[in-house]
Amino acid sequence: MKICLLNDSFPPVIDGVVNTVLNYASVLSEDGHDVLVGTPRYPDTDYSVYPYRVVSYPSLNTSGLTGGYRAGYPFPVEEMAKMASFEPDIIHTHCPIASGFIARSLRDTTGSPAILTWHTKYDIDVHNSIHDPLLASESIKAIVHNASACDEVWAVSHGAGDNLKSLGYQGNIRVMPNGVDFDKGKASQEEILKACAGYDLPADVPVFLFVGRLMNYKGLPLLIDAFRKIADQADFRMVFVGKGTDRDSLIRKIREYGFAYECREEDEKIHSYPGPVPKGKFIFTGPISQRNILRAWNTRADLFLFPSTFDTNGLVVREAAACGLASMLIRDSCAAEGIRDGHNGYLIEENADSAAEFLKYACRHTEELHQAGIRAQNEIYISWRQAVAQAEKAYGEVMENAKAGLYIREKPLFDDPLYEMTSDAIYRYMHERSKTPPQFPGMLDNLQIAHDSIISSVHERISRISDDLPDELSRILKHFR
């Protein structure tokens, strides 16, 4: 199969969705499929290092608004022509924003089916980034509309699908879980000692671990509040691996409560800060990208703590399970899917009292935690090869459904004219590029003029067509002019 994978981010940015696309591309390529990845362009990035083709397209620097991400231009005609000439059998977008627009345009150009995977609660991301209520609402509508326009929608968990439906999506959803790139097994004692060197980690004190972005909406203040409630009853070490904009506010809360803490700072040295509370300490390692070091921390810890109701899949929970580490999760959260309380993990209510009650118990029953970790390893772990194998099978079903005409919409969407126009522009561009011009002085200048003329005409037609479409689409288009 020829498979076009699209996402609004790619290395040098690393997050859960980027990791998904990297693993899809790697496994599919290893299985003999022809893979192309389309993604916004980041300056000074070499995309030729991958064993598959990467087509990068123009982007805007929105890192101040989005925490390091760039926004891809949703109608990059030249780059879409390159993707269309790839002649994909499947178009699979992992983001409904710029990648969603491109997927729809490619679908109209090539006739191949388009799939969207719903990875995260985009409505929360939108509200965190866009503080104007009207603009945020319109952005969410556009995202859901792009999802509705795809031939199939997949979700990484049942909870992720429920989130999409709560935003107004009315179609069918196929649950397609993500995998983890940890093999089953623990790190060696030598690797653990190397990874944890310099930190205050007594052998007889329980170690709790969190890995991820240090953001308050991940439920991290709840953990600190819970540990405060048991500070006079149990000793512990709470390790935070990662970085995030709320790191400093978490440290302020820890200081306010009188706890000691340690931080690996930018100088790569571990700095210790004492506190009047005699028991308990918090440790901030900073971000860790080396997978062997993350495995070592997952092996050293007694329990993984993940009090997030934001995450739709909780890959870090499965990574912990790969190392035989069980997790404490919020009951009925997406990350808690597949967890049986007290068997292969632990479920609490979303409040500090419930967390404190369980953590007090956990500090005194670490061997029980270890047994739950073994069961988690055997029951909730799924490798990327297993996950992508499920997707490969589903790709075949999607192609058969498309051939049978099962994805033909009974009613056109209000913005279909826009995508018909974009598809026409892609055809025009590909036609012009396929011509063999005569060789004469100034030829390259003339080709550049022709290229610029085509791109300019697309922009002009976007402006004209927006005047004839409903107000909702016009408002969306104004943000791309």
Mark where each language-model region is.
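Aromatic "clamp/platform" in nucleotide-sugar-dependent glycosyltransferases that forms part
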Residues: 309
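A conserved mid-protein helix/loop that constitutes part of the nucleotide-sugar donor-binding site
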Residues: 19, 206-229, 234, 238, ...
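Short alpha-helical donor nucleotide-sugar binding micro-motif in glycosyltransferases
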Residues: 147, 287-288, 295-301
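Short hydrophobic beta-strand element within catalytic cores of glycosyltransferases
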Residues: 326-330
